[in-house]
Structure formats: structure tokens, C-alpha cells
Curated annotation (Swiss-Prot):
Protein name: Alpha-tubulin N-acetyltransferase
Annotated transmembrane regions: none
Domain of life: Eukaryota
HAMAP family reported for this sequence: mec17 (MF_03130)
Residues covered by region (Disordered): 216-244
Any one GO MF annotation of this record: tubulin N-acetyltransferase activity
PANTHER family: ALPHA-TUBULIN N-ACETYLTRANSFERASE 1
Every N-acetyltransferase domain range: 1-186
EC category: transferase
Length: 272
């Protein structure tokens, strides 16, 4: 994919990483105008390649745009080929962390903040040449992660075949959302500490038939169990006898005696 401007100054290396600043890694602007021009050019590249990726996947709207990237903590890897003209952008890979509700191997719902593959595209003229593997390997090295530890957002059949061919990923854990998770996902050292505290359970409440199931975390269940144990072992409350004027005997209530048909010692005639 060639552009109307020279891409060589933007790509100081073959694969660059871009965050919400819309400036590639290794790029140093000498003045403000140069930085603004660079962000405008990177935005044009991202929007164009993102549109091509959406068309290749049969999507009506692109997953990757410069505006979405600017308003998120995700980042994009762009692959570049140098030539005698303006250079070529040949691939894009978008990744980022997202909060997901997924099923583990036991079928329990778990809330994790997981690294995800959000978009992946190599131009048709450069496919089957090893560029996709090179781009994906570069991302794994930069993110310090293994492929099975990532959730894949709405992968195409071509991407699923790519992951199986190059990384041996084929054992999927069935999910109810658009993400694909492979065995080994929950061994991820990046979010394993979040899993135990966010493992979800369905309560067996009488209100389930009326309001639907209620999900509680392991932490909430532990606190509830702890409170129950404290209530069981708490000592009985001993009521202290009243003292002073509060210990004086109160007169009987004639109205209560009349209601309950009890004899009363109070005269029915008023004192005159």
C-alpha cells in the first residue's frame, strides 16, 4: 500500500509500534509542525489500512481507525517495506487489554483483563510470504507474551488457520461472546492474579425465578462465609437488670386488661 507522501521518515525500522499519541516508535520531531504532520500521515495510514482489513473480513465498519486508537490505550504495529519511492505499508496488527467475561475449563464465568488481538491484516499481495508470522512474532516479543495467552476478537477462518499452523493453537475453550480463547489462556502470568478474585458463581436465591441469577465473586462468598461464622461463634447477649428509678414497678395498663378481658384492680368509677 503506497501513499501520496514519503513514508520513510516515519518508519525508522521495519515494524513500528504506535500508541494513542499517533507517533511511531523511534520518531523524533524537530519542531511542533513536524510532529503534527507525522500524526496526520499516521492517521491516514491507519484509516486506509484499517478499511482494507475490514473489507477483507467482510465487515461493514472498520475495527481500526485513528480516532479509536487516540481514545484508547491500545496500540498498533505497522509493517513497512522500503523502496525507491515512498515506501509500502504491508501489514497491521492491533492489540490491547480488555475486560472480558469468559468461561474457564470448568465452565465457570471469570472476569479477566486480558491481552487481545483486535485486528490483523497483511496485504493480499504480500500474503504467504512469511510477513504475517514476522509481524505476529514481533508483537509477541514486544508484549512479552505467548500466543495462547491472548484472546482473539472475532477471528476469521484464515486467522484461525494461521494460529494453528504457526503456533499449534487448535484446542479452544467454548465461549458465549465473539472472543476465541485457547487452552493455556488461564495460565497467563499477566492476569492470573485477577482470576481468583473475579471468578463468578451463580447464587441459588429464591429470587432467581423472579429476577434471574445473581453472580457473586469468590471474595464476596468468602466475606459472607466469614460473617456467618462470626455470627455463629458470637457470645450471647446478657441483658443487665435495670437500676435506679428505671427499676420501679410500672402500673398495670387498664386498657390492655380490658382488651384481653383480664380482671383489673382499678375502679371503673372516676375519682371525684
Amino acid at each position: 500500500m503506497e501513499f501520496r507522501f514519503n513514508c520513510h521518515p516515519l518508519f525508522r525500522q521495519r515494524i513500528v509500534r504506535i500508541n494513542n499519541s499517533l507517533l511511531p516508535t523511534g520518531f523524533v520531531a524537530q519542531h511542533r509542525r513536524e510532529a503534527l504532520d507525522a500524526t496526520a500521515q499516521i492517521s491516514e495510514i491507519i484509516n486506509f489500512v484499517g478499511q482494507l482489513s475490514a473489507q477483507a473480513q467482510g465487515l461493514s465498519n472498520p475495527v481500526t481507525t485513528s480516532q479509536k486508537l487516540r481514545n484508547s490505550d491500545h496500540h498498533i504495529y505497522l509493517m513497512f517495506e522500503s523502496n525507491q519511492k515512498h515506501g509500502l505499508v504491508v501489514g497491521i496488527l492491533k492489540v490491547g487489554r480488555k475486560s472480558l467475561y469468559v468461561f474457564d475449563q470448568n465452565g465457570e464465568t471469570v472476569n479477566v483483563t486480558a491481552p487481545c488481538v483486535l485486528d490483523f491484516y497483511v496485504h493480499e499481495s504480500r500474503q504467504r510470504g512469511g510477513l504475517g508470522r514476522e509481524l505476529f512474532d514481533h508483537m509477541l516479543k514486544e508484549e512479552n507474551i505467548h500466543p495462547e495467552e491472548m484472546a482473539i476478537d472475532r477471528p476469521s477462518e484464515k486467522l484461525l488457520g494461521f494460529l494453528q499452523k504457526h503456533y499449534g493453537l487448535y484446542k479452544k475453550i467454548p465461549q458465549m461472546n465473539n472472543f476465541v480463547v485457547y487452552e493455556g489462556f488461564f495460565a497467563n502470568k499477566h492476569h492470573a492474579s485477577d482470576i481468583d478474585g473475579r471468578r463468578m458463581h451463580i447464587t441459588a436465591s429464591p429470587n432467581t425465578n423472579l429476577f434471574g441469577p445473581t453472580f457473586t465473586t469468590v471474595g464476596e462468598q468468602r466475606r459472607s462465609s466469614s460473617q456467618t461464622r462470626q455470627q455463629v461463634v458470637s457470645p450471647p447477649v446478657v441483658q443487665q437488670p435495670p437500676v435506679g428509678r428505671y427499676a420501679a414497678k410500672r402500673p398495670s395498663c387498664s386498657m390492655a386488661q380490658i382488651i384481653h378481658n383480664s380482671p383489673t384492680t382499678v375502679s371503673t368509677e372516676p375519682n371525684r
